[in-house]
């Protein structure tokens, strides 16, 4: 383990997952800063413009930190990782005894491994690359985990086709299955997936998304859709989303035009899922906001949404800058971007 570590802050398309008081990060795309400013078409980034990351580290959220100062609570775990450089993978806390991180698929460049599942035991600090049964084609996707069953759900298109699939991975038996596609939306990527307590996965945004919000029920393997009321958010690709205890899905960032990655102007919108009909609203933010971004990560710790890295296409940050931002979500009528994280003490 390496303390006093600073991760590459220009990364995007990385993964993040919370376990206890640690936010784990892995992978992503790192631009070549000397020539990136000359790239005009962002929809397909050639290898000479960017490389894939093999960093693996965590942010310790058991201690306070400030975003306008050097963050000293990063811990580097790259020395124990066996994963090749990668980006755009599915990554969840979803394993035996709730102590295992599971990663599947993504973009490995020209070095795609035969077995696409990697697991990290946070107790023994060991990575494994197990052989699984019924492995699907490689996909770029988001995942959600049902902690009661230990199953990961990944709805996506394959890397080389437009065919939709609902892939279900049982982390206990290391077995793959498929979910129903009856009533499913078209295959998509660059969306967010949020599992509600009632068993519905809410899919928001993404390329080829339009109309009502798709819902997949993990309890009975069925698709439905929800027509929403309230504010009409700008359609967007690759935002982030977090779920609060009172049923708010907070959606941040995203792009409008994939070829240019133009940022959305309403970069913080909220979907209230508590009623029989979901309601959108544009968040009221009473503080200055960071530059809108996409391809970032967002993790909810207590009532703080911690946003890390990503792209805004206005500039590449200096390597000395923190690219971590904190949104206080405690007041649903008044959201605040703040510069200090203070762990909430349990009573």
Map each language-model feature to its residues.
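Kelch-like beta-propeller repeat domains
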Residues: 1-347
